[in-house]
Amino acid sequence: MKKFIATLFMAACVQVMAAATVVEESADGKYIIKNSEVTMTIDVNGGKILSYKYGDAEVISQTRFPNSFGSTFWTSPQKEWNWPPVPEFDRNPYKLEKGDKLVMTSEVSQKLNYRVTKTFTANADKSITVSYTIKNESDETRKVAPWEITRVPNDGVIFFDAPIDAITPAGLLDFKPQFGLSWYLADEAQQNRKINADGKGWLAYCANGLLMVKKFEDLDASQPAPEEAEIQVYVNMRKSFIELESQGAHTELKPGAELKWTVTWYLAPFDGKAEPSEALKKKVKSLAKL
């Protein structure tokens, strides 16, 4: 069985070298991390990633739906708060610290008594690491898991390393096994659809000449929160947006304790077609050092 220690994961799993994190403030009050050709724009409201670009090419959906835009962070399981998202984590202003990293810290959630901190760091390989901390501000021992949600356009192909029978509900999204991975070509339907999967610690999306890979800790099937999963893909109805979702281990936190969880983002051009191929698989493994 794979072992997981929340407070040690960041050092044990992510093998990237930090670069100088250049942070600029835009005219409209957003914060932009520049790392060579790669830029990431973060809003202090909700600590949301609103843009992730290679040059002028954008990978995050720029369509704004209520409570469903940009890249955000929630606590899991969702059944503890249902809907809409917890305002202190998803839309209220975060406290900002700038230095060799960009750090944003939320208010304490009135409903859940957690506080979230997000730390953004540029790396020498042009990737950007987002480290999340959940702190238990209650006087009770609690269990919680970290959860990152990123909206992208309904285009291209989504893929990861998991057998088809590890994707549930079976057949809800048309994943196909090819080149040792599971692939889903974006389509549309008249209803919302969502799948869970037990992957291998990474999730990739390719569309419009860009390849994005997100790398995180690889979980055993027993480690996610109840009714949740390491990898989730949500496809909103019609041709609107898709959510790329990843979760960390369901972890017990004593009062005042915290967990840390890290996702490293990679973005690069891809000249081939956005469809299953050995070339796309090789590009992912090279880019994210898998």
Feature annotation, model-predicted:
Residues 7-15:
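Bacterial N-terminal signal peptides
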Residues 21-25, 34, 76-125, 139-144, ...:
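Extended, loop-rich substrate-binding clefts of extracytoplasmic carbohydrate-active enzymes
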Residues 31, 38-40, 50-52, 58, ...:
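A contiguous, surface-exposed recognition patch within enzymatic or periplasmic domains that forms
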Residues 13, 20-29:
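Short, Gly/Pro- and small/polar-rich lid/capping loops
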Residues 1-4:
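Positively charged n-region of N-terminal signal peptides that target proteins for export
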Residues 37, 106, 256-270:
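Short, hydrophobic/aromatic-enriched beta-strand segments in well-ordered soluble domains
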Residues 267-290:
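Terminal connector regions
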Residues 30-91:
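Acidic-aromatic substrate-binding/catalytic surfaces of carbohydrate-active enzymes
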